[in-house]
Each structure stands twice: as structure tokens, then as C-alpha cells.
């Protein structure tokens, strides 16, 4: 009986050992194939003169190891950033974020990476920003889904991929591997428009039969590309025409009634302000959205598209790179600007002038000289209604203002609250 037991135990040990060896060889074989594909990907990117900056948070670090474990990475990769802590992510994106793992955050990171690549002296047409954010299995079980969002930003398009993982069937290491695979796959797929597109490998992502990757792409018109590349400061949001081109002259931006804002989203409060301002000024409102902003990340193409579609077809919407008001008044000379009280107050806040009161004074004098006037509306600010008539405005601006009293207009609609409900 004991001899039989020993024989059975020996057989089981052999089977276990053989299985381990098989799995080890199988895994190493797949790793070798993946390494070969990564090497081929780097070669293809290098041949197209592509330069990449990667930013990932919450997972996906295996993609970094895959890209740098062999030769050729230095010809393609400019920088990798891993803002893992909440404060680190907020510092990178310019403030507290409503959610840390979402398609929007992935796009913000990708645009940040794209801008960084351009700042490192990469021609915009060759710059690629990859942003990834993941919520994966951790020591403490998560109430939400396990998911990965990967965005790729180029001069030509914004692409976002979302993968929701089947919860509770994989180890953290396995989910990390899939996150890394998805990053590599999206990098390869988003860079296949060059002359060497046939040389790019198809990167594998180990999904179950129930899992699918959802992809959304926003392709930019030429005017948007010129704006993002910095070749233009202002474009018509719905037109291919740009300033200096045959269809659009600088006269079209002079003596306008301009309503600047982020409009994320455009809501009834904005509509009421525009309607009343139009009656006061006797001309139609034209909206302005700056893709760059002192307080917020640069807007990507998907962001722009989602905001612009909310405007009526007959309404004119301008896209600019004017993050400072001193730039807006140059783009729209002798125009009247529609502002909320909170935005109006920023015009004389030294924080927006590197803390310099002298720079602030110079800017205020310049703005007052360039504009036709302001129409200023009251807004809820820090929990209470701010009546613009109660503000201690600089005299040079005060003389140019038409304040709309609370009796004529008040709405407490919050864009922040609307975004919160929209993103739930």
C-alpha cells in the first residue's frame, strides 16, 4: 500500500513539474513574441520620426518595461512620467480632478504628454502623447469596476480606448500585464498613418470572450490642427478658414460682442447671459473657447467636439490660444466682452500675473485701451451671490463696464455640478 502511495505521489509530482515547465516555456515563448513585436514597433516609429511621451497612472507600468528592455527606445521615447499619488496627478493636471480614472483623465494626460513632446523640440506632426489611467485589483477590494483607459494624442486626432475587466478573475499582476498590452496596442494602432504603416505589428491584448475594447476617435479639421500646433492663434470652430486665409479677414473679429468661456457644458445660464447681453449691445454674441487655460489642461479634440456640438448651427464659435485676457483683446480689437463676476475679478488678481502688481497694472491699462467695454453679470461665488456692482473694480475698467444687477439676471446653475451628474 505504501509502495502504491509513493508511486502515485511520484506521478503527481512529475505531472505538476511537467505542467510548470510547459507553462513556463509557453509564457516565455509568448513573452519572446511580444518582445519581438515591441522591437518592430519601435523600428516603425523611428522610421516615421515619431517621438513619444508616455504618462500613466494607476497601472500600465509593464508597457514601460517592454519599451525599454530592448534596444531602440532612445530613438522614439522622449520621456515617461508616472504620477501615482493623488497630489502628483493633481499637480500635473493643474488642480483637483473630479475623477482620477476616466476617459477624460486619460485624454488630459495624453494632451499633456503631446505638449511635452512638442516642448522638447519635436515637430507637432511627429509628436505623440500617450496617457493611461487604470483602476486595477488592489489589496483592498474596490467597489467600482476594474478598468483601463488609454488615450493617444497626435496633431491629427484624439483617440481613447476603454477596457472594463471582468472583476475578480485575475491577479493584480495579470491585470497590470493587460494594461501594459493595451497601451502598446493603442500606440501602434494610432501611429499607423505614416509611410511605414505596413511595418507596424498587431499588438496582442489578452482578453476574455466577455471583454471588449471600446474605441472613440475624434479627427481634427485642418483649422484645429493649425491651432494646436501653434501656427494660428484663432480659428472659426466650424470652418477650415483661418486668419490670413482668403475666407477670413481680421475685420471679422473687430468690434464684436464676445462671450469667452470654457462652456463645459453650455447651459441655460450661459444662454440667458448671451440673450441679455445681445439686447444690451444691439448685436449677436460670438462665443470664444481657448484651448489653453491658466488653470486647466489644454483641450483635446474630443473635448472640443463635445462642447461645440451644443451650440446652434447659426451661432459663431471661435477657438483660440488666448489663455490670458491681454491676448483676447488683441484677437478681438475694440470688442465688448461678456463676463461673469468671477471672471471679471480675475482681471485684477495678481495671482494671474505671477504675483506682480506692476504687471497687473500694465495689463489692466492695456485691456482698458483695447476694449470697447464689458457687460458683467453676477455669479454665485464661494457659496454666495456676487453682485458685480459691489466689486472694487479698477477705475480704468469701471468706466468701461455695464453691470447687470441681480434684479435683471440671476441664475445659480453650476457647470461643476452639471459635469458631476453627466459623468456619473
Segments the model singles out, each with a brief description of its role:
Residues 26-45, 66-69, 82-87, 91-94, ...:
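Nucleotidyltransferase catalytic core that binds NTPs
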Residues 63, 105-113, 359-363:
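Amphipathic alpha-helical interface surfaces
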